[in-house]
Regions:
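Ser/Thr-centric signal marking residues that sit
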Residues: 53, 81, 112
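Non-transmembrane alpha-helical segments in soluble domains
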Residues: 58, 62-65, 69, 90
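Phosphate-handling substructures
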Residues: 1-62, 141, 145
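Acidic, low-complexity terminal tails and accessory targeting/binding regions
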Residues: 3, 15-27, 70-75, 91-145
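Generic beta-sheet signal
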Residues: 67-68, 75-81
């Protein structure tokens, strides 16, 4: 991996949670719970104070996704990003509504592999595997087993 050739593209950053960033998780859950409950039915419901709305986040990530059309077929890209970004990309690939992504388990340091092909119709993607890191750990180290 030659990081000298790495591009850092802010379009792939996690959603800006505004005032919720840095808040202890227990407090964050209490404050954000009503928004996340409403979000399951209305994408516009997630709008952290002084942060990025889910709709703006979705549009930013999907624009970056479409920019992958600029790469030639058979390119190999490594995208290092956050769970929120995957909650936009994976449902897009799988044809799921974006607010139905919460059943997808996306733990820290997991990785997914997508195969992308471009055509006149646009970008076609296939999910080859998801959440491989959870299965790479021995059972004693993996709290999900």
């Amino acid at each position: 991996l030659n990081l000298a050739e790495a591009d850092i593209d802010p379009a792939w950053q996690e959603i800006d949670y505004g005032d919720l960033d840095g808040m202890p998780i227990e407090q964050w859950r209490a404050v954000a719970a009503p928004q996340f409950a409403a979000f399951r039915h209305d994408l516009a419901a997630l709008a952290p104070p002084n942060g990025e709305t889910w709709l703006a986040f979705r549009d930013r990530v999907l624009a970056a996704w479409q920019a992958l059309l600029d790469y030639p077929d058979d390119s190999h890209l490594l995208l290092v990003t956050h769970g929120g970004v995957l909650r936009v990309i994976l449902p897009t690939v799988l044809g799921m509504p974006l607010n139905a992504s919460f059943p997808l388990h996306i733990p820290f340091a997991s990785f997914s592999r997508l195969q992308l092909r471009t055509s006149k119709e646009g970008l076609r993607a296939t999910l080859l595997f998801h959440n491989a890191a959870a299965y790479a750990l021995p059972a004693a180290e993996n709290p999900d087993q």
